[in-house]
Swiss-Prot record:
Family matches, as InterPro entries: DUF5864 (IPR043845)
Name the record gives this protein: Uncharacterized protein L332
Superkingdom field: Viruses
One of the Pfam families matching this protein, by short name: DUF5864
Organism: Acanthamoeba polyphaga mimivirus (APMV)
Similarity-based family: Belongs to the mimivirus L332/L333/L334 family.
Amino acid sequence: MSMHNDLLFTIKVGFNIISSKYIYIKFSNPNKFPNKFSNKFDKLLKKSINKNISTIILCDNIDCYNQIYAKTKTNLYNLILIGTGFNVETEKYYTWDSYYEIYMVKYRVIVKLQSK
């Protein structure tokens, strides 16, 4: 069995009124998307270095039911940044929800910059 480890995709769980839950799979163009992402990443990297920020947030405020989205985004960005020395990670954090008056679990996709 052959696995395509370089397939660029993300999986997201969504909700709508008609069918309560659905799964959304988005495939990215392997020729265009890496260049588009690299440009975005370079801008974020320069901004982080200029402001002396140690963590770049690539994707933020991902709901707890969409952990698979955070994981597939992390995998997607790691495939693009392979060989650059950057490691993309999924981070779990808690935020206060004033409507329900509880702490909610959220996820973000980050790159931690190493200080020298």
